[in-house]
């Protein structure tokens, strides 16, 4: 079965791609609704067409594009999903307007006629809806075939042409028997007599879609490197080890599982750019350049940063010893949110800091907290390993010298002068932005907007002193300290963006939904139940899970994308969080960097559909996010990648402190609660500065359930917070 899948710039299209591949036995051809290579005669190469969901309205030609003509002509079987359904109905005389209420990421029990698309499906059918508009009136030639419990038309068919539409999303993980519905569309196509035999449709007629078909970068003769390693029993504190080996070096970094325990807190990595093969790379998205420094000299090349990174990694062939972890040196650092301009986003705002900074680490230390083993790693080229082995010996001696040493006490008096904390958008301004978000949702422009604010202050805070305090008051499995010249990043992130192991197994763990810990076991249990059953939190989480499935699916082997477990309440020292896990397997013809490009920025920091929602965010937030909302982690020489989402993170640069906070705005959101959520998420900063959140009108609990009154309650008793 040859299917043309037209993408209306949605964030669920590749979920349809994988479902259709399973139903048809071959992959559909994907084009966007404004594909310049498209011409109507190309339809003859296909058996049927699926018109994807998408933002906007079918009344706006730019939102529906070439789908309008395909739907109007009805030359071959067409299935419209959500926007595709609305546009197809509009093309044949139906009316499309506002639904009684926006419903995004919410389930409904749909009653149907049991024929056509619904043959053999349960009655009623549980489906997931993502829509603000609906078909409100049908002409005689269109027939309704399904309805929701609130009376909204959920499916239709044309009485004489092979056209079908569904308002709900069969590709959502929350929709019952979505695969079966698409298989029924395949069967309807076969009955219509459109089935063609032979190879994949569209071969030689349309350019391959990107990035799902993006091939690995090719270079000239690869540079051959080798990793040598030394393991030692851990007898030293991680903070002491970093302070002794790397802190005063060039571009020191520490990927710090400051909350060891469990799978997410097993490893910490630290290093710098002091070795003989070390390099640094910085991106400037607006200039379209990458500046690389090596051996004391800098050079600037014109290139998109992720393209440059992929080519650089493709030009290395590294022999790696057997190690019990994926990190074996490579590029370490941060990708800023404005790098979205290379990932279907716009270059709307210029960040005051580099759009990405990575260190090519040729020397590093890895701490395995589970086995209490330390690994020293060094990179050598050709047979020149004497210097590397000398470093291994020197590092071992330094560690031996600090074995058993406790970290220095944090300062007993303020170590900085910090001005008042100011918000980019004060409380009234932020509430107005939330209202605009909900207007956009009601108009069908977006399902969910991850709106953020930026807290800023003048400060002379010392990065190392501040990070030492931060990791005590807000330990996290994905904490990080990056002291990269004029910019320092101090992160206490709990969220994994994307991990890819050396065998191509991918994993993302989006978080949507947070509650503080209770003061008593009874209150704690009640908070867990409330989080697990809250319709708003589940809707937020489901939307991002479906988006992440799409993002990973763009570079994944067909049928390998799995969301399991979902909607799990994970309990940490300070919070309960609603977490889902999405896994997939990287395609043979793709690459780890391509997978990062396809998923960046993380959907939990944008909302959905991602591209349209990022445009809304650009307009409303009125400034750059910088490192906040980007990613921190590594691209290993083994091909492995592990990146966190940059949240709960302090950025110090140019005598200024910045700390981003935000939350997902959906139709069910209460604006006052959304502002309060930003205050709750600022708890690590508030403790660090011993201050209150600007504009907060009511007292609340911070992230560990203690009263958030600007004090340092809950901090270690021997700690006096700087500033």
From Swiss-Prot:
Reactions it catalyzes: chorismate + L-glutamine = 4-amino-4-deoxychorismate + L-glutamate
Sequence segments annotated as region (PABB component): 255-723
GO cellular component terms given for this protein: cytoplasm
Disordered as annotated region, ranges: 96-117, 192-219, 693-723
Enzyme class, first EC level, given as a word: transferase
Active-site feature positions: 82 (nucleophile), 169, 171
The protein's Enzyme Commission number: 2.6.1.85
All copies of domain Glutamine amidotransferase type-1, residue ranges: 2-195
Organism per entry: Streptomyces griseus
Protein name: Aminodeoxychorismate synthase
Family according to the record: In the C-terminal section; belongs to the anthranilate synthase component I family.
Functional note: Involved in candicidin biosynthesis. Catalyzes the biosynthesis of 4-amino-4-deoxychorismate (ADC) from chorismate and glutamine.
Keyword Transferase attached: yes
This protein's pathway: Antibiotic biosynthesis; candicidin biosynthesis
Family matches, as PANTHER family: AMINOBENZOATE/ANTHRANILATE SYNTHASE (PTHR11236), AMINODEOXYCHORISMATE SYNTHASE (PTHR11236:SF18)
Keywords: Antibiotic biosynthesis, Glutamine amidotransferase, Multifunctional enzyme, Transferase
Residues in coiled coil: none
UniProt GO molecular function: 4-amino-4-deoxychorismate synthase activity
